């Protein structure tokens, strides 16, 4: 005999479900309990009436799954603290579909989503009647209609005829899609300097077929543009005369001037500071300006970035970048070099996943250690794919980056070389708890002499984002003064595992390995460590403790230890 016992949702009555003939299936039992959970204990002393109500509730649960000839026996014991109801069920045979007619009419009858849904219709002749599946079919067609702009769609006929004598059912379904609506005009709540940009970011134009995905993507683009404090695009009511849907946009622009201040600390660089000044709006075309000052004891830099959008400012724009950078040699208060640069960058989203950047940069670099001044004109390109789920503290994502830069005396550079950089980072989460982060960074420079390559383009390792036990940019071949001079190749890797220990807090362990030299795999370095990750509204805060694993003849590389503090996931 099958028996089950559980309490109703109101916890005033305890139900025992039994099946003397062992016919009760698990799915049916669960459905009966769902119906009883929603059943309120009647306020009455009339046990006969109470039994009748319980029996009717159980009967409805069985009929929903196609069992119309079940035998239900109800007995009630009200002498206990909580009334106890015993229900014995003999399911009987289910209703079988002997006729099923399903027709789709209207202008959308050959529309692929409707056709796909129609072809997956489960209530075919010979199958068991299931009212849940029947309702799911109806809801699915209406969901498709709303998602793709068939706002006049309706069920012309939807009925089930059950014959208890023959234990059979006939289903009649006729769905009329009506006409498909198109996008109308974009209406902005009040006049904005941003009107042109708001229109340019729309992934549709007037007269295009309506889709709810287009509206969702439009809202994402508007909110990612960094022009607005708040912005929302909402479809108006469908116009049955024009068969169009206008889009209403409400937007509040960001302040004309924004100042951001941030700070960090590592045991090798000490305090770090950043001051950022942003003008989100320069004019009605969406031009913007960002100026950034970064300071630490090793490096100081100023960057000015003027952005000119061409259509959607998230996907298609040009950056003009003016920069100055001053870097000290490792453990040396003397200046290592100064660099002035001017860059042109053309950013374009070439497909759903990949972004392309064409670049041309002019660099003038003064190296005090060699009393040399070099100028280079360097064209190049890069391809980037970035995916993430979870906002500013993602739990899934990856980033792929490939870049090629070329310098040649033929167009006025002081030396000829080319540089290839590749990075691949992956973040994955398992069982909603375990997170793994993998990072691989490969670089190669083809040059006759490393001194022909600007210092800022050579490879160094060490710091917050790779080989964390080692000082910032301290790992590279050494010059005649025993100072890091940069390298022509690099190969770096990281594996990191983190586990939640408290809400918003994760414990991490990691292992970094790498080599930086004029040839691949010349010298190998590695470290291991532990860290704390804290998810905050401003991003992921990382605190790491890293210890080097290799001994070295060079004192500063002999099993170093560093503490680093940073904001943001290194993805």
Q: Which residue ranges define each predicted feature?
A:
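Extracytoplasmic gating/loop element in the C-terminal half of outer-membrane beta-barrel translocons
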Residues: 245, 433-510, 518
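Residues immediately flanking
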Residues: 513
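N-terminal signal peptide c-region/cleavage motif recognized by signal peptidases
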Residues: 4-6
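A generic structural motif
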Residues: 106, 328-330, 406-410, 549
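Gram-negative/organellar outer-membrane beta-barrel architecture
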Residues: 111-113, 211-213, 217-401, 418, ...
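Short glycine-rich, acidic/polar surface loops and turns
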Residues: 493-496, 525-533
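Periplasmic polypeptide-binding modules associated with outer-membrane biogenesis and secretion
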Residues: 9-29, 36-267, 276, 290-308, ...
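Transmembrane beta-barrel strand/turn architecture of Gram-negative outer membrane proteins
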Residues: 398-408, 415-448
């Amino acid at each position: 005999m099958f028996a089950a016992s559980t309490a109703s949702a109101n916890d005033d009555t305890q139900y025992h479900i039994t099946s003397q003939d062992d016919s009760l299936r698990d799915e049916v039992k669960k459905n009966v309990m769902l119906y009883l959970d929603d059943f309120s204990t009647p306020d009455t002393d009339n046990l006969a009436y109470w039994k009748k109500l319980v029996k009717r509730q159980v009967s409805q649960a069985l009929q929903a799954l196609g069992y119309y000839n079940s035998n239900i026996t109800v007995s009630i014991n009200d002498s206990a603290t909580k009334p106890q109801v015993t229900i014995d069920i003999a399911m009987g045979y289910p209703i079988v579909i002997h006729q099923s007619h399903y027709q789709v009419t209207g202008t959308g009858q050959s529309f692929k989503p409707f056709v796909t849904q129609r072809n997956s219709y489960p209530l075919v002749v010979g199958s068991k009647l299931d009212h849940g599946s029947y309702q799911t079919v109806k809801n699915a067609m209406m969901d498709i209609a709303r998602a793709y702009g068939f706002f006049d769609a309706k069920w012309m006929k939807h009925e089930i005829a059950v014959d208890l004598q023959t234990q059979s059912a006939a289903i009649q379904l006729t769905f009329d899609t009506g006409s498909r609506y198109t996008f109308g005009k974009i209406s902005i709540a009040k006049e904005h300097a941003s009107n042109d940009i708001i229109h340019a970011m729309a992934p549709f134009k007037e007269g295009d077929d309506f889709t709810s995905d287009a509206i969702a993507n439009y809202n994402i683009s508007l909110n990612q543009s960094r022009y607005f404090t708040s912005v929302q695009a909402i479809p108006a009511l469908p116009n049955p005369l024009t068969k169009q849907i206008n889009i209403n946009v409400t937007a509040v622009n960001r302040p004309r001037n924004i100042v951001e201040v941030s700070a960090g600390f590592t045991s090798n660089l000490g305090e770090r500071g950043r001051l950022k000044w942003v003008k989100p709006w320069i004019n009605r075309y969406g031009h913007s300006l960002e100026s950034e000052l970064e300071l630490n004891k090793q490096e100081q830099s100023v960057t000015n970035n003027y952005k000119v959008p061409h259509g959607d400012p998230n996907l298609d724009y040009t950056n003009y970048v003016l920069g100055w950078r001053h870097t000290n040699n490792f453990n040396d208060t003397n200046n290592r070099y100064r660099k002035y640069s001017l860059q042109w960058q053309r950013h374009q989203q070439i497909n759903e996943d990949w972004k392309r950047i064409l670049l041309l940069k002019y660099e003038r670099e003064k190296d005090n250690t060699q009393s040399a001044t070099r100028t280079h004109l360097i064209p190049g390109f890069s391809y980037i794919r970035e995916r993430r789920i979870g906002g500013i503290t993602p739990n899934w994502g990856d980033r792929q980056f490939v870049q090629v830069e070329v310098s040649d005396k033929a167009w006025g550079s002081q030396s000829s070389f080319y540089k290839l950089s590749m990075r691949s980072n992956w973040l994955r989460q398992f069982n909603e708890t375990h997170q793994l982060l993998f990072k691989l960074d490969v670089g190669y420079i083809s040059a006759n002499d490393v001194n022909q390559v600007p210092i800022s383009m050579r490879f160094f390792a060490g710091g917050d984002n790779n080989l964390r036990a080692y000082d910032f940019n301290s790992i590279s071949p050494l010059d005649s003064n025993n100072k890091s001079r940069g390298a022509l190749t690099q190969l770096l890797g990281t594996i990191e595992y983190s586990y939640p220990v408290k809400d918003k807090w994760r414990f991490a362990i990691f292992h970094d390995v790498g080599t930086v030299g004029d040839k691949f795999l010349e010298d190998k370095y590695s470290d291991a460590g532990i860290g704390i990750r804290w998810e905050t509204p401003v991003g992921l805060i990382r605190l790491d403790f890293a210890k080097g694993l290799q001994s070295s003849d060079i004192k500063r590389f002999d099993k170093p230890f560093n503490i680093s503090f940073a904001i943001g996931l290194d993805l």
